[in-house]
Every structure is written in structure tokens, then in C-alpha cells.
Amino acid sequence: MDVNVGGTENIIEMCKEHNVSKLVYCSSTGAIPEEEKGSIRECEGSIPLDPERIKGCYSLSKAMATNVVLKAAKEGLNACVVHPSGILGPEDFAMGETTKTLVDIINGEMPAGIDGSFNLCDVRDLADGLIGAADKGKSGECYILGNEPVSFKDFTKLVSEESGCKQMKFFLPISAANLIAKILEKKAKKTGKKPLMTTFSVYNLARNNRFDSSKASRELGYTTRSYRETIRDEIRWLKAVGKIA
């Protein structure tokens, strides 16, 4: 909260103090309350901070920070917000969670998948979307930068086809994955080690991942490349830097 909310408040104050021409805040699709069915679109005005609909401390902190930015925009600051979905693509030197999942699948270190879905934008498309928001984004507006949802099963199939690794055969139902995650979280509390799977990560696979990026496409010129292209390019990069054989 101190970084995502307090830090955002500090940045806004600095923008005002130094007459910054524009602020683009990078939020998250996790900050938008989930709709059970249909496509999920940007919130208008402010995000309703309903803990029943915004899951996880990170997402809640992003929602709170987004509201801080939108409030500042109403007060005259030239500021807009982008909501990226999950991020995938080459040159992830920090080895984020999605890249780590990709590497684990290729190296055979993930014995089973989960019967859920992702929504992942290519980091290069995200970068273009951020530039588009800086150039064309309207003050006080929010823009989703996502992709089409892809099932875990289809994702692993693409990884197998592009890397040559064995195709994953077993996919846990969400209910079973959630039960295992709860057990792993309890064990992690005792050992102090990070659990292999969390109830929050299971939720992110089980939730509605149909984020609508049409507003960003219309107003910012946002485009997305195929999952196959992103996965192929990331695998090439991972091989080049020695992360996979």
C-alpha cells in the first residue's frame, strides 16, 4: 500500500509541483471489479473498492491508486490510466511469474496444469500502448491493454509446439487446484518458503479473463500480436540468455 498508493500520491504531488505536462499511470486489470459473464470494460469516474469483487492486496492497492489518479485528473491534472493484463514476452530479465511458468513448462518442472485461462499482453504491445496513452490518451480516462483469453491447455500446447518440449497431459480442475493451494499455503507459513501455488494464482486462472481492449484500439491505436508469436520470441530470447536449453 505504501508504494502503490502512497508512492502514487507522491508522484502526483511532484507532477503538480513541476508542472508535468502529462501523467500516465500503469494500473492493472486486476484493479477492475470482475464481471461474472461477458466482457470486462474500463470503470468510468472511479473504481468501486469492493473487496468482494477486487481480489488480493496487490489488486486492491492498484485500484486505490487508480482512484487517486482519477481524482487528481478531476482536479485538473492531465492524467490517464492504463490497465495491462498479464505480461509476457522477451527480455524479462526479472523472470516474472508468467516467464517462470513458461520456463517450468519447458523444463518439465510443472507436472500438471490447471483447467483455467490467462489473459496476457505482449510486453512490446504494452510498451506501444503506453506510448499511445502518453500521446493520445484523454485526461481522466482509463484504457485496458489486454489480449484475447487463452486456456492453460492451449497455452501449454503452443509452448510445446514452439519449444519442442513434451506436451502437458494433466490439468487439475479448479476445485482440486484450490484445495491443493490452501494446503501449500499452510505449509509455507510453517516453513517460511514461498508456496508453489496460491489460492490467488488459482483465482486468476478461474476468473473471467475476457478483458475488452477495444477502447484502447480505437483511441490509442493499440494492437496485439498472436500468442504464438509472443511465445516463439520469448523462447528464442530465453535460449539466447541460457535460461533454457
Give, region by region, the residue ranges found by the protein language model:
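Short, flexible, mixed-charge acidic loops at enzyme active sites
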Residues: E36-G45, A94-D104
